[in-house]
Amino acid sequence: MTLANFIIAGTEKAGTTSVFTYLSTHPSVCGSTVKETDFFRNGYSGDHSNDALQYVKYFANHCGQKTIVMEASPGYLGSGMEVAPRIHALIPQTKLLFILRNPVDRMYSSFNFHVGKLNIRKDMPFSEY
């Protein structure tokens, strides 16, 4: 059964998408069908057999014999207290990479990303965000 053995976590607007994309180009690496599976926040039930069957869907049909099978879900960092034991229960040998960014730079990037998308006025200054 093919499950992730490498997870990229971190925070929003820190580069998880870029790292996921770059690593996915390596011939030994297989990325999940959806970059942010968020499985261990939203899909995990605590039923080991069922969870494995649900999680494998992100990798089973395209990873073949790749050595590194990965996903990237930035939301895992903020939910660490609940997510860490879930990851350990299902895939205890997996490696995790946490990507962080200067908080001010991350917030400014988030502001620019969300302007016009989350009911944030396009003319709102960053200082009001």
Model features per residue range: what roles?
Residues 1-78, 86-99, 103-129:
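PAPS-dependent sulfotransferase catalytic core
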